[in-house]
Swiss-Prot record:
One of its GO terms (cellular component) is plasma membrane. Intracellular vesicle trafficking and protein transport. The keyword Nucleotide-binding applies. GO terms for biological process: protein transport. It comes from Arabidopsis thaliana (Mouse-ear cress). This is Ras-related protein RABB1b. Belongs to the small GTPase superfamily. Rab family. The lineage of its organism: Eukaryota, Viridiplantae, Streptophyta, Embryophyta, Tracheophyta. The keyword Lipoprotein applies.
Amino acid sequence: MSYDYLFKYIIIGDTGVGKSCLLLQFTDKRFQPVHDLTIGVEFGARMVTVDGRPIKLQIWDTAGQESFRSITRSYYRGAAGALLVYDITRRETFNHLASWLEDARQHANPNMSIMLIGNKCDLAHKRAVSKEEGQQFAKEHGLLFLEASARTAQNVEEAFIETAAKILQNIQDGVFDVSNESSGIKIGYGRTQGAAGGRDGTISQGGGCCG
């Protein structure tokens, strides 16, 4: 399927916040409650429509363990968007956001659009981080923000598409040099070209829900 643009995303955050589950829900529309930790980096892709324009999202799901941080850092380069994920039931994952954000700002394109996601909002009875705290963190750091649930799919679609809409707006405003591949954006010329990984809407490798 042809696309106007290809946007590269990276998903970051602590181990166990549900990064791989968010990706699987977005690409395959299913929830897998138990699987292995993500080792290194995994990949998914899907076509979306933003403002009537077909856009392919190429999404890199990273391991949250400290031992993989150096690998994760190498994937910041060349990403147009990032989903920064914490678990609303685990306070420490929220407390670690500043460290993840510092990493992203240090190693990524300065114009990268970042969506902060408070995952597992279906477990509101176990909530350890208020929605207002998430909103405040996002406001202070210039991030988009949503609470979502990989289990129920609430706001999962919206998180990926709102990030794409922000990137598209930045292109239209002249923020990105789309001819530079390090921007994380490829122009599609109306046909699919050079897109690695599995077919649209699928994950080419297994995902790790806890990763």
